[in-house]
């Protein structure tokens, strides 16, 4: 039977998936006699804007056209045709049911309260307008394919209590770029991020033990992944593969690499599948600050890597380096005064056997412990240059560490306060004097030669955008000055 009008007759007790509604129905009235509604009952009612339940119904209720159970502890159906772009789930709700938001097009943001503990299968499936979701730490279970084909979803943060997610949670989220996984996650489910074609980077937590079949299949722009040493299971096609529909076979990405530690499951998987493996090394300071880098390249001291030490010290107001830190006029949080900014500042450096400061030639991964008394998820890490300008390192909090990449060690500040950052980099202005001339090329050459005691803006110096500062940057600046058709700041 196909229902085209808006009312269900009194006496009907069950609305199941076999009771087909017209695709263009906009309003449905549910009588008091209904005692059971199937999760898929309204699945394809893409124009539906309102569900109204008789107030005398003992099992169900509605509010603002949205269907709940009588106690309003479960949200059962948010009609797909509602035009609102934002929705706040009521704080009485503990469960978002299977298919609850399925097919919603206009919705861009859903605010999930701490009362929610369970999110059902396909709860947000094919919500094509949804852009950003934060799963609160109260959530302990999620069904399969929760965000299946959310093609506008760009950012997501998972609850710390999600340890073993079900399959295909983010499958076909083709615009997903930023993911913060649970710090306690043990498994990555089958097809969890498959066909997330815009995903370029993801930090896997140290607690991870298993990556299941095809977890990152068809992630076209994911070129490298670092696999934690605790991973003991990696199933078929988990990394580095795509499914070729023409030939109906799995194929490897030619340019994919796996980073990990010697003797690990990551190395075993890479070698078994003919994928390039990059062995990682690490160093640590007495402050608990760690760096990870490739053992294969010369980013840390080349052949003298073992003689390079990582050092750090926490700065205080009496330190000369601290004098450049001034928050005046640089705070985005209107309720925070400069003198009230809570922060921890480190001077981080690499030293050779002669005690001279050296810099890595490639980007390395840095892990700074979350300071005592700080909320890791609220922390930001800023690089502070010689002129006191702040650059947000876009650190990710995982397992009690703030993790980011850099090719330069200097002053780094950890705070929960939002600070205004450098909005524009003048590529080529290596010495920071506001103009681009041969003196900038000289500064870069001095830096490459290992000289110290001068100011250099390493971000502005990387004019060929390859993530490092070397003589090629100096040459490009000289070409620009000579009138060659080159663009600074691009490869």
List where the protein language model places each region:
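Surface-exposed loop/edge segments in extracytoplasmic proteins
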Residues: 388-394
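C-terminal beta-strand-rich structural cap/linker in extracellular carbohydrate-active enzymes
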Residues: 403-421
């Amino acid at each position: 039977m196909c229902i085209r009008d808006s009312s269900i007759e009194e006496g009907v007790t069950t609305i199941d998936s076999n009771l087909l509604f017209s695709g263009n129905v906009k309003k449905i009235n549910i009588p008091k006699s209904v005692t059971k509604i199937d999760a898929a009952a309204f699945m394809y009612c893409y124009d539906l804007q309102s569900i109204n339940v008789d107030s005398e119904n003992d099992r169900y209720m509605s509010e603002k056209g949205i269907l709940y159970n009588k106690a309003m502890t479960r949200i059962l159906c948010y009609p797909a045709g509602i035009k609102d772009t934002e929705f706040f789930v009521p704080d009485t709700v503990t469960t978002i049911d299977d298919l609850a938001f399925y097919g919603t097009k206009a919705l861009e943001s859903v605010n999930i309260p701490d009362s929610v503990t369970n999110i059902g299968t396909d709860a947000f499936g094919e919500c094509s307008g949804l852009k950003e979701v934060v799963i609160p730490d109260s959530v302990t279970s999620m069904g399969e394919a929760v965000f299946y084909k959310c093609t506008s979803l760009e950012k997501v943060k998972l609850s710390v209590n999600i340890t073993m997610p079900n399959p295909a949670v983010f499958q076909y989220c083709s615009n997903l770029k930023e993911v913060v996984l649970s710090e306690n996650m043990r498994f990555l489910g089958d097809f969890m991020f498959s066909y997330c074609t815009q995903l370029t980077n993801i930090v896997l937590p140290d607690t991870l033990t298993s990556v299941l079949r095809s977890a990152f299949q068809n992630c076209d722009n994911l070129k490298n992944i670092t696999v934690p040493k605790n991973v003991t299971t990696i199933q078929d096609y988990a990394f580095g593969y795509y499914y070729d529909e023409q030939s109906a076979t799995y194929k490897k990405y030619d340019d994919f690499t796996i980073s990990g530690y010697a003797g690990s499951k990551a190395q075993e998987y890479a070698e078994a599948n003919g994928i390039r493996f990059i062995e990682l090394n690490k160093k640590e300071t007495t402050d608990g600050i760690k760096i990870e880098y490739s053992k294969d390249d010369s980013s840390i001291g080349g052949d003298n890597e073992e003689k390079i030490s990582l050092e750090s010290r926490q700065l205080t107001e009496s330190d000369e380096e601290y004098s450049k830190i001034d928050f005046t006029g640089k705070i985005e949080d209107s309720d925070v005064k400069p003198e009230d900014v809570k922060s921890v500042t480190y001077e981080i450096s690499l030293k050779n056997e002669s005690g001279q400061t050296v810099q890595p030639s490639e980007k390395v991964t840095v892990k700074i412990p979350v300071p005592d008394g700080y909320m890791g998820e609220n922390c930001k890490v800023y690089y502070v240059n010689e002129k006191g300008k702040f650059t947000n390192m876009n650190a990710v909090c995982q397992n009690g560490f703030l993790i980011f990449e850099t090719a330069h060690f200097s002053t780094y500040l950890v705070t929960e306060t939002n600070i205004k950052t450098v909005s524009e980099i003048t590529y080529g202005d290596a010495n920071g004097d506001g103009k681009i001339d041969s003196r900038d090329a000289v500064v870069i050459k001095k830096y490459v030669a290992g000289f110290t005691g001068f100011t250099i803006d390493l971000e502005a110096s990387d004019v060929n955008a390859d993530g490092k500062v070397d003589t090629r940057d100096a040459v490009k600046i000289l070409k620009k000055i000579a009138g060659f058709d080159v663009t600074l700041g691009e490869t």
